[in-house]
From Swiss-Prot:
Residue numbers binding carbamoyl phosphate: R70, T71, R120, H150, Q153, G280, P281
Annotated protein name in UniProt: Aspartate carbamoyltransferase catalytic subunit
Catalytic activity of the protein: carbamoyl phosphate + L-aspartate = N-carbamoyl-L-aspartate + phosphate + H(+)
Gene3D superfamilies with a match to the protein in the record: Aspartate/ornithine carbamoyltransferase (3.40.50.1370)
EC number(s) per entry: 2.1.3.2
Family: Belongs to the aspartate/ornithine carbamoyltransferase superfamily. ATCase family.
Amino acid sequence: MNLKAITLMQFDSNGRLRHLLTLEGLSRDTLLQLLDCAAQNCALGVDPMGKRNVLAGMAVCTLFFEPSTRTRHSFHLAAQRLGADVLNFDASMSSTSKGESACDTLKNLEAMGVRGFIVRHPEEIVIAQLAAVVGEGTVLINAGAGRSTHPTQALLDMLTLCQAKGNDFSKLKLLFVGDIKHSRVARSNLHALRTLGAGQIRVCGPTALLPHDGLLSGCVVSQDFDAMLEGVDVLMMLRLQRERMEEGLVPSLEHYHANYGLTAARLARAAPDAVVLHPGPINRGVEITDEVADGPQSWILRQASNGVMVRMAVLETLLGCA
């Protein structure tokens, strides 16, 4: 199934957003509406009294076929804060270990009354397959599909950028560093940044870890990390996706850190008020040092807290009127 078809599956017959499968095909206005809702959630804080009943009586399920800390638990907290009943699916303890397909798993849970599915799967196509079989009134949210898409991560990163740098991205210089080829975060972020009118996007990493499918069209691309740091406003550090990589793409972790690890000395080359982002999990001493990850220019924990607020916004937008 091609990307255009998946994009169209997100909308109902009236053009209303029904699922969140990818940020591709979503308008600037739609992204800004989601970000504005998330910003309102930030203003309400961790105990949003006025939103406790938005999803009251509704069952949602975190249907994860891959490990997760931040995404799974932030979705769980987001749904709870909106009053939903949350089911946490454990693939290792389910009938998928007996051969049941993801589609059959979803349809059975749907028959029990679950109306919102938050899905992570290592195979990109499965998200589209699930969207094709869900019933009317059931909502599907992509929580990470293979190496292709992670829409809510990109949304929380955009919210963090707004907080750090304001709402106008047109003059920003942003640098993505690391394993771009296997990163669903990088792909979704690049689509969001283009839709929101980002200024200069730079990409840096070993040649073997850069995609050659047109994703980097319009980006400034280099293997020279030190040169690319000059004047950068935002650094997005990405981990090596070793679970998706072929052996031998990187000589060693030590070699990678020497060439692409963000240290305090390297960070000093960027703009004085540059901010550092990382979607997690962090591999300390590989793509980033402790000093930088825990330093004053790190917005990494803000990303984590924003994850709850963004995912609340997505849930209430899609399920609040379901």
